[in-house]
Each structure stands twice: as C-alpha cells, then as structure tokens.
Amino acid sequence: MCMMGSVFSRKGMLCVLAVWCAASAAYPLRLRYKFRKGDTHRINSLIREDVFVNDTLAHTAEITNRITVHVSEVRVAHGSAPDAARYVCHFMTSEKSPNNTFRWGRHYESIFWRDAFGVYDIDRSFFMPVVRNVPVFPDYDIEVGDTWEHEAEEAHDLRDGFGIQTPFIVPFTVSYTYRGEVQRGSRRYHHITAAYSMSYESPKRTHGVQRNAKEGMYPVRTTGVSKQNLYWDNELGNIAEYDDEFRILLYLSGGTVLRYQGTATAKNFAPERFDPARTVVELQETLKDLHMPDAKVRETEEGVTISIENVQFDADSASLAPSEYEKLRKIAELLRAFPDRELLVSGHAARRGSVQDQQRISEERADVVARYLQELGVVDAAHVYTRGCGAQQSIAPNDSEDGRRKNRRVEITIISK
C-alpha cells in the first residue's frame, strides 16, 4: 500500500465509535450508549480518497475497513460513574488493488472501555479506533435543533509513512446538531450532524522522537475539517450508518505539505448466527451431491474454507480454462446461502519461477475468481477480499506436473466473524 495513500485513510474507523446507543421513543429525546454483554457487530466502510503532495495529485485510493466488535464485559453505573462496556475489536484495512479487488490487509486489535455518554477509556498504545469520543451525547434531553459540543481526538498510525512507532494523537472539539427524524430506504432514523476543525501544533518535545525515526519526515502541524451525517436507529439503539466529507493537511518538517481529502460511508451489521462446524458438514454433503471430488471443505481460523484443488490455470498465469468456470458457478450457488457473510479468496501457485513471480501469480488468480463471483452476483466488491499465498502452502510435491497442478488452486473462505 502506498504510504501517502494509507496515512490518513481512517474515516471508516469512525463507525466503531458510533454504535450501540439507546434513545427514548418520544421527544424530548435522550441519547445514551446501551450495552449488553455478548453483543457482536460488524462494521464495513468504504473510503474514496485523493492524496496531494504540495497541491499535486499523487495518489487516488479506494479503501475498505472491516471492523468486528464484541462486548466482553458490562459495568453497571455506580456513584457518579455511568454504565460502561469493555469492547474487544478487530480491524482490517485494505486498499483496492490494480486488479480491482480488495487485498486482505493490515490487522489491528484494540481493547477499550466506553461509558454510556460515549467517552473512551483507552490505552495510548492502541492505534485503533482512529476517531475517539465521537459521538458523545449530552447529559440532558434534546429536541430538534439542539446543539452541543465535546472534546474528541484522532489517533493515526504513522509507522509506515514516517517511522513513528506510537499513535499520533490530534485533539479537537466536535459540534453536534440534532436534525430530527429522516427516512433512509425502508427505515426511519434520527439524524445527527457532527462537524469539527483541527489545528494542531505537534509538541516540541515529540519532535526529537519523530526525527529519530526518519530524518526530515515528521509532522509539525496538522489541520483539517470533517463534516459527518450520523443516522441513529432508535429501535435497535445503534448508529446504523454514516457518511463523511473530510480534508486533512499534514505539514512536514522539511516543508512538504500532504493533503488528504475524500468521502467515506459506513454501515453497521449484526450478522445472523453462523455455526462453522455445522456449515462444514452441510457443504460437504452438498459437494458430494454435485460430484465435485476436487472441492474440500474445512473449518479454519477465519471461517469455513472451500478449497478447489486442481483448478486449471494456464501454467505461470492467472488465466482460467473455460471448463473451470462451471466449477465456480457450482460453488457460487453454494455461497448464495450466506448473503450476510463476507468472502476471502486465496490464490496459490506451484513452486516455479521466482518467489516474486509466485506471489504475483497467486494474487492474480485470487483476483480472477473474486471478480467472477462479483459478476455472478454472489457478492459485491466491498465484501470480498483477496489474498495471494505464493507457493508457501503447497499441498503436494512440486517436482512433478501432477503435484504442481494440485498446488495451482484457489480457496474461498466464508468469514465467520
């Protein structure tokens, strides 16, 4: 991933800050975060971003963020302290590849507490979530047109771009306005706007730490604006979706100015219960009925994986033989039974050529299969990810054509979390 395309690709992380809230059904309206131990959610966002270096367009990126959230503990209000919950979150960020698919990207874990008003208690070592204390609700009932403010912050991961090994924290004040109820598709939501401006001078005491990472490449000033629409589902007690327009300028010590601007959208999902062990048994029976001996099913760390062995790719290429599309059409019909699940397509190569060639071919093979599943309408581009494994996970010896043919395979994982 390009450094400049990844530094501030962060808006999809906002959604994890804006969920699990409760509101009364009548006006005036009281907004509070609501917690229940064992709750799980998945948040998907899509960011379209342009990156400028000294006002010259340098990079355009389309980035997806996948966030899984688990409420592991709930703390009941006591004294002046409100209710709070402990969240265990896993984040994955991915930039769209030149082959028009999203690579299975960088992973983060974060554990934090958040109280009923939305205020965070999070260790400074965690890079995610990026936007923290948004939204925070007032301690009084609100009506249409009411406004309030609260302090918040962004925590950016600048390890790749600048060698800064701790989160880069930028504080700001958010202004909120309650706009009333709106219709979004078949649902009615409470509409809240949130806006903030940033103007932050990096403390001089941090310059030395940053300079030691990469000489001449550290931020001394950060400015920017963000305008967000938050859509509150009062029945479920969640922020159901949001959109955002943002612009951030990063002034570097050497005089270079980086500008990141774009839009983001995100939705919150509560997937239906998924039993991996049972799914494996059911898919094995179905594959047997379809007479597909080259397809195997197993439970993996990421979910349920269908391994399609002996896929007929042309040697040293990602081109599928015409007969192989029929195999994929059969697999696609199986996958239609899981419309709320995301997919991970992994490509594998035989051990021929250089390691770099093996990696490239495996990525391209995964891309071919992922795009075909999109063409068949099984999944959209934002909910299927690809991964190239090179020749690192061979299932047969590579010293014969038969073994190499088995290793030229594709695996499709139904992601369980």
UniProtKB/Swiss-Prot annotation:
It comes from the Bacteria. It is found in: Cell outer membrane. It comes from Treponema pallidum (strain Nichols). Residues 1-26 form the signal peptide. Gene3D superfamilies: OmpA-like domain (3.30.1330.60). Keywords: Cell outer membrane, Ion transport, Membrane, Porin, Signal, Transmembrane, Transmembrane beta strand, Transport. Belongs to the outer membrane OOP (TC 1.B.6) superfamily. This is Outer membrane protein Tpn50. GO terms for biological process: monoatomic ion transport. GO terms for cellular component: cell outer membrane; pore complex. The keyword Ion transport applies. Residues 300-417 form the OmpA-like domain. PANTHER family: LIPOPROTEIN YIAD-RELATED, STATOR ELEMENT OF FLAGELLAR MOTOR COMPLEX. The keyword Membrane applies. The gene is tpn50. It is a multi-pass membrane protein. GO terms for molecular function: porin activity. Pfam families: OmpA (PF00691). Could function as a porin.
